[in-house]
Amino acid sequence: MSIGLQYLNKKEKETVNSFVKELREKLGGNILNILLFGSKVRGDFDRDSDIDIFILAREKGDIRDAVSDIAAEYFLEYNVPLAPVVYSLFEYTKNKELGSFFFEQLEKEGIAL
């Protein structure tokens, strides 16, 4: 079992893998990185927890809406709540320069997908 993915059940793993694959197929040229983070990585989740996925894009443009639409389709089809968070490279760089707590945590716990 992959480190950091041990808290995902089989259905969640399959859903996340399919979601990431579809993102890369549909938006691949704009996607720089995809990370799993949050309670499902740390192990402090509860039965109502969603699956946090960070997506780093070259440019945000229409990608946020496309990602949200795909995540909604996966929820309807698999009943697995995905919570994608999309940042552009510019936003990511600026927030890191400012010492954003979110990005510090993301670097500590994020698992590349």
Language-model features: where?
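Catalytic core of pol beta-like nucleotidyltransferases
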Residues: 1-33, 41-47, 57-113
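Short beta-strand->loop micro-motif that forms the acidic, two-metal-ion catalytic signature
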Residues: 52-55
